[in-house]
Each structure stands twice: as structure tokens, then as C-alpha cells.
Amino acid sequence: MVVANIMTPEVVTVDPASSIGTAIALMREHGFRRLPVVKEGKLVGIVTDRDLRQATNSPLVLRERWYSDFLLEAIKVKSCMTPDPITATPATPIIDAARRLRQHKIGGLPVVAADDDRRVVGMVTITDMLDCLIHLLASEDPID
């Protein structure tokens, strides 16, 4: 089985010049914990809910609401994202993707087009892999 069988193809992305407030709003709206960061159609990074919490972990943010709102708009995604993230392609075997997640202690991989243009075509997460495992253990028929 390959990543294409279990990935989420509908990807919500964020621009590196967007505010972290925008990234937080997108994560909340769509229920995601990570967003690929895309500039001019190409993957340049990934930002997670943890990155955003760390970026706003300031005594002023916790104490002063007005300053918190200011920071959410002033701080840009590019300042807290992880550049050049570990990726997979749709043809990557699921076992290889799982090993990457485990080795790098991360929760998800952007899935990029196989032609190496860094165009994001999906996301695959630990949850996707657990769903696959549950399906395989619960049935005789593996996912196509």
C-alpha cells in the first residue's frame, strides 16, 4: 500500500507571509494541527499548532489581551514554521512514511507531487495510518 491510499487530498495551506492569527484561524476552522506553508504553489515549510503556541508564549500575550491580538497579526508564519519539511509522495510506501514519522518524531507529512516540483497534493498523518491499521486488522480485505 502507498500513501495515496490513505492521504487526505484536500489540503489547506498557508502563505509564509500570513499572520499566525490567520494560521490559527485556519487550523480551528478545519480541525487540523498542522498546515503546509506554500509560496507560489511550492512547499516551503510546515507550521504546527505547537509552533504557534510557542510563538505566542510570552508573558505579555498571557497578560495583555490587546498585545495578544497585536502579536497574532504582527508575527508571520515564516518566523515560526519549519522550513523544508520531511515529505512523502503519493507513491511512497506507507511503511516508509510511517518510519519517517517515527524517526523524526512528527505527526504528519505533506505529500508532494512525484515530479519533484514541491506542489502539495495531500497530507498523511499518524491518524491516517492508525485508521489504515484498524481497517486492516478488522477486515480480510485490505485497502486498495
Report residues per predicted region.
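Short active-site-proximal "capping" loops at secondary-structure junctions
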Residues: 42-43, 54
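Short hydrophobic beta-strand segments in globular cytosolic domains
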Residues: 38, 44, 120-121
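The conserved cystathionine-beta-synthase
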Residues: 14-31, 37-39, 87-106, 112-114, ...
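Tandem CBS (Bateman) regulatory domains
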Residues: 1-10, 48-86, 98-102, 120, ...
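A cytosolic small-molecule/anion-sensing beta-strand core signal
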Residues: 7, 39, 81, 113-116
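Hydrophobic alpha-helical segments, especially transmembrane helices
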Residues: 34-35, 51
